Amino acid sequence: METVILKNGTVYDPLTKDFEKKDIAVSGKKIIAADEIPSGKASIIDVTDCLVTPGLIDYHIHLYSGCDGAVKADIMTFPNGVTTAVDGGTCGVSNFEMFVKTDITQSLTRIKSYLNVSPAGLASSVFSENVNPEYYDLEKMRDLFHTYSEHLVALKLRISRNIVGSSGLTREPLIQTIKIAEELECPVVVHMNDPIIDVEEAVEYLRPCDVFCHMYYGDGSTIVNHQGMVKEKILEARKRGVLFDACNGKGNFQFKTAIPAIQNGFYPDIISTDFSPMTQYVHPVISLPHLMSKYMNMGMPLAEVLNAVILEPARQLKMEEELATLKAGTTADIAVFKIVEKDTRFYDFTEASIEGHQLIVPQMTIKDGAIVYRQTDLD
């Protein structure tokens, strides 16, 4: 594999939070220092006026090909500057090992995963998973987290009214899931769309590093009150270390919640796509860079947008020293973007929209030192 030199770009390093004009050199699968460039031919790529970052991490996406709600990892990652993806709990104990065989080990994208507490996971879009704790298989969960520790990173639970309510349960699935996570020593990612219990009660159960998923959902009990202010218990949860993922999806984001929250400075800790076939390269998601552009146009500083797709997800994966930096000796997962001036409308699933004037446009993706995506006009 020949040496690649990205010249004249503006490099952002999330670990140091610095933007710096400099060159980045890659040899083999690693980033190398400029004075370590081996003699011989090198491929020099001019990235003037481009932003160079560590590869993005899509912290919530559905990738298991054995269900009807998944997308292909490499198709949805590399063209968007993404080098690491985390499956959002598509599988439970009954089908996770098949996911490893059919998708995780067969993709160039680095794939991590949540484990759904429901044994069959999200097997079908025709009916919802059964979240009754009576059917949780703790022994199998324990075995999977031991055997697949390099892949499994969290437990996943959905507590929406339309999922939990038909069972006659309320807070029991959440309480039991947290209890299991304590034993497994892992975070819990909780899907909070219209939760069966009030959102302020639900966040009281969450621990530092647990993730409140779909933070800008707009119906039922949400993170903002009728005056458009972020609720006190939500603010307290963030202070004690609970993380908030925007996790857009088809119907999991509404401007009527996001705009007042962001005006209050309540930005997402994590920005993810929640990709499924319904949102594959179409509105309201289109791509992770499109969502990043939306938040930038809503007033979120660029550095914070980048941290929400690199640094915070990498911390959750306990890989920040490898995936959230471009220092010499680390894995050569790199993304290159241009920020272009372009009038663009961003939509939610209700067709509400805002107008923006800048877009983050992918130019190149490098995974483990290999160029896996490149715009035709990038010299």
Can you say where each PLM-predicted feature lies in the sequence?
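Divalent metal-coordination and catalytic microenvironments
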Residues: G9, I24, K29, D49, ...
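C-terminal cap of metal-dependent C-N hydrolases
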Residues: G9, T331-D379
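Alpha-helix-loop-beta-strand connector modules within alpha/beta enzyme cores
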Residues: T53, T102-Y114, I180-L184, A237
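Hydrophobic faces of well-ordered beta-strands that scaffold small-molecule active sites
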Residues: I57-I61, A85-D87, I111-L115, V153-L157, ...
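Divalent-metal coordination cores built from histidine and acidic residues
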Residues: I75-S160
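His/Asp/Glu-enriched, well-ordered alpha-helical/loop segment
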Residues: T257-I339
